[in-house]
From Swiss-Prot:
Its EC number is 4.1.1.65. It is a peripheral membrane protein. It comes from the Bacteria. Catalyzes the formation of phosphatidylethanolamine (PtdEtn) from phosphatidylserine (PtdSer). This is Phosphatidylserine decarboxylase proenzyme. GO terms for cellular component: plasma membrane. Binds 1 pyruvoyl group covalently per subunit. It catalyses: a 1,2-diacyl-sn-glycero-3-phospho-L-serine + H(+) = a 1,2-diacyl-sn-glycero-3-phosphoethanolamine + CO2. It comes from Brucella melitensis biotype 1 (strain ATCC 23456 / CCUG 17765 / NCTC 10094 / 16M).
């Protein structure tokens, strides 16, 4: 095994979105250290925290079009019926919604819950209420992604929160996504909502811990053989 492989297998990868922030914290730590030694160590603690925040571990994703996989790490905070945001053009009838709340200690990379093509990406400005509140779905700043999957259209909504003031989505309209593929992140904790077609059966409960790219949120009830997975 090479030195590069050893380092890769020992340390959790850091997402490129974090590089400027990590470098900034480190430079500020050095500058503060010139003024007073204890300030350097305080700065280094913050730098390490920033590295931890932007960690991007590999995930083993089930490659099955009949499954809907969690787009975020965190706690399942809502399972039930809700009207999807108007910008998704999914109609005004309630759909099954599964919400995953991310705290400041969660991995903040968001992954596609299904394989499919992005129909649209719409950003909406708004408030920064506690993302655990139900009204955050309609009142908070959000980024809505509509995906045409093998089983129909699925809405994925990144919602800003009380601390999270920055939603990042690097995927665009007409992009093809693989299930479990990274498509964005929300800095410093928030929530991701998934709006499911009526024939999907939810497989999680409120309070359950979800892992992005691995936890099955729902399925379509089709009999399956041996699972096929992808590590990414």
């Amino acid at each position: 095994m090479s030195l590069t492989d050893t380092i890769r297998n020992t340390f959790v990868p850091i997402h490129r979105e974090g590089y400027p922030f990590i470098a900034g914290f480190f430079v500020v730590s050095l500058m503060l250290g010139w003024l007073w030694d204890p300030l350097f160590w305080i700065g280094m603690v913050l730098t390490v925290w920033c590295i931890y925040f932007y960690r991007d571990p590999e995930r083993v994703t089930p490659m099955d079009d009949d499954l809907v996989i969690s787009p975020a790490d965190g706690k399942v905070s809502f399972v039930g019926l809700a009207v999807p945001p108007a910008e998704l053009d999914l109609g005004y009838e309630p759909m099954t919604r599964v919400s995953v709340f991310m705290n400041v200690f969660s991995v903040h990379i968001n992954r596609s819950p299904v394989r499919g093509k992005i129909d649209k990406v719409v950003h909406r400005p708004g408030k920064f209420l506690n993302a655990e509140l139900d009204k955050a779905s309609t009142e908070n700043e959000r980024n809505s992604v509509l995906i045409e999957s093998p089983h129909g259209k699925i809405g994925v909504v990144q919602i800003a929160g009380l601390v999270a003031r920055r939603i990042v989505c690097w995927s665009n309209q007409d992009d093809e996504l693989s299930v479990g593929e990274r498509f964005g992140l929300i800095r410093f904790g928030s929530r991701v909502d998934v709006y499911l077609p009526s024939d999907a059966t939810v497989r999680v409960a409120v309070g359950q811990t979800a892992i992005a790219g691995e936890t099955v949120l729902a399925d379509y009830g089709t009999e399956r053989g041996e699972p096929v997975v992808r590590i990414a």
